[in-house]
Amino acid sequence: MDRVNHVSNLYFIPEQAALAKWLVKNSCGDKAFFCNSGAEANEAAIKLSRKYAKTKLNIDYPVILTALESFHGRTVTTITATGQPKYQKDFGPLTPGFEYFEYNNIVSLQAAVEKIKAAKDQGHGLAAILIEPLQGEGGVKAGEVEFFKYVRQICDETGALWVSDEVQTGMGRTGKMWGYQNLEGIEPDAFTSAKVHSNL
């Protein structure tokens, strides 16, 4: 071996820079942030959403909405984001600031948004909707276009971010490069991806 291919992200890594350019060219994103796993990518997206809500939307208590039967990782915060009690059992207290709705159910999402609005006087506000474009753990449920149009509408109206969790759906696993590309041109504000990049 003549050179080290990867070291800490503290240092410039030419291959990582090339991957960042490729990701931007082949997605709706205009920047890339690298970390070490899918759970860490979702943790970073949660941190990004909270910081954005506090600094740009002036929300004191940011709330992130996620779907029931979702899967977002195995850290304490990402199991909280994961809408499945079986992954949360015995790991409490869980990270505050999450509420849940039924996947592909506009009425359920509306109710979750209204619950956050009702707590506005306590400083609560919608920071993000973190959602998979296709649920894997939830029984392989494809996202419905009309539902995701509503997700986009809610985020546009409130200023919240739509974060697409592409850890299980990205890099061609749904027939398109990214899962959100199956939604007839509706695009998220940010998306996460992970292990599939080792296939490049």
Question: Which residues fall in each region the model found?
Answer:
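Conserved N-terminal phosphate-binding loop of PLP-dependent enzymes in the Aspartate aminotransferase
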Residues: 1-200
